Amino acid sequence: MSAFQPTIKRRESTKIYVGNVPIGGDAPIAVQSMTNTRTTDVEATVAQIKSLERVGADIVRVSVPTMDAAEAFKQIKQQVNVPLVADIHFDYRIALKVAEYGVDCLRINPGNIGREDRIRAVVDCARDKNIPIRIGVNAGSLEKDLQEKYGEPTPEALLESALRHVEILDRLNFNQFKVSVKASDVFLAVEAYRLLAKAIKQPLHLGITEAGGARAGAVKSAVGLGMLLAEGIGDTLRVSLAADPIEEIKVGFDILKSLRIRSRGINFIACPTCSRQEFDVIGTVNALEQRLEDIITPMDVSIIGCVVNGPGEALVSDLGVTGGNKKAVIILTANVKKSVLITKI
């Protein structure tokens, strides 16, 4: 790893716990995803949650749209270890039901959860059972009066929606909560989070909502979340992709890894290749990524096709492979090298 270590001054925030996972304060930034199975299909949902846990998910969110889904949630919760967030919209009574079943966090949407008395009922239940809440504001479901006031989603509209419900929780003397202000537009989301970060001390859950497919969504999320994380904003994140949720976890860790905020597994440094390459760099990288994806120990591995940059990259990596004179050279340190035939690489 390079000796140059950038300094990111993290925003100060209070610490809460989602299950056994600390969020905020000095805790590592948590990476989470959301199931896309039918929650009433208990077997499929449990299998997906366990798959997400295997690739490093700290927290998994599960949509609970009906009372039948709430009953299924009870069975799901009994079969998994990773903390679960119940995603609640429209019917506050579902939140009360899953609270009985050991949910680790409740996500409520201010745009559709209803009157303050319903929020009070959820808060009272959460307090009694020591369950944190996420106030999840979304540009696509702002309250009608805010839509009329601002005309369209704006950073100020997202902030006002969030603060409106933060005020309710403050008034109810409930401080075990985190907040998100998501939008599909990168600049809208980033500016809303910047405003929110200045306004409150609670942990922030980051996300660019409805970001798109695997490629475009990963890029939008990397840009938006990367901007915020580099400014020290953010305590937990989800990369929202129209793809396998496992990819959300992988991309989330890749974003944190790129900013040297939190590392998990191998960080591959590979050249884009040109006619100077002495071995199949692309094939080697693809094979190693698949073969070594279960490794969780942080490690930098450089795979460079020729001697132009290969030796230099290898010296700041834990292990380097570089092409040279029709051979591949494996470099462990400046003084430990081994040449192998290209066919053996």
UniProtKB/Swiss-Prot annotation:
Molecular functions per Gene Ontology: 4 iron, 4 sulfur cluster binding; 4-hydroxy-3-methylbut-2-en-1-yl diphosphate synthase activity (ferredoxin); 4-hydroxy-3-methylbut-2-enyl-diphosphate synthase activity (flavodoxin); iron ion binding
Reaction catalyzed: (2E)-4-hydroxy-3-methylbut-2-enyl diphosphate + oxidized [flavodoxin] + H2O + 2 H(+) = 2-C-methyl-D-erythritol 2,4-cyclic diphosphate + reduced [flavodoxin]
Gene3D superfamilies: Dihydropteroate synthase-like, Sulfite Reductase Hemoprotein, domain 1
UniProtKB keywords: 4Fe-4S, Iron, Iron-sulfur, Isoprene biosynthesis, Metal-binding, Oxidoreductase
Keyword Zinc-finger annotated: no
Organism encoding this protein: Haemophilus influenzae (strain PittEE)
Note on cofactor: Binds 1 [4Fe-4S] cluster.
Cofactor: [4Fe-4S] cluster
Gene encoding the protein: ispG
Biological role stated in the UniProt entry: Converts 2C-methyl-D-erythritol 2,4-cyclodiphosphate (ME-2,4cPP) into 1-hydroxy-2-methyl-2-(E)-butenyl 4-diphosphate.
Top-level taxon: Bacteria
InterPro entries to which the protein is assigned, alphabetical: Dihydropteroate_synth-like_sf, IspG_bac, IspG_bac-typ, NO2/SO3_Rdtase_4Fe4S_sf
Name of the protein: 4-hydroxy-3-methylbut-2-en-1-yl diphosphate synthase (flavodoxin)
UniProt similarity note: Belongs to the IspG family.
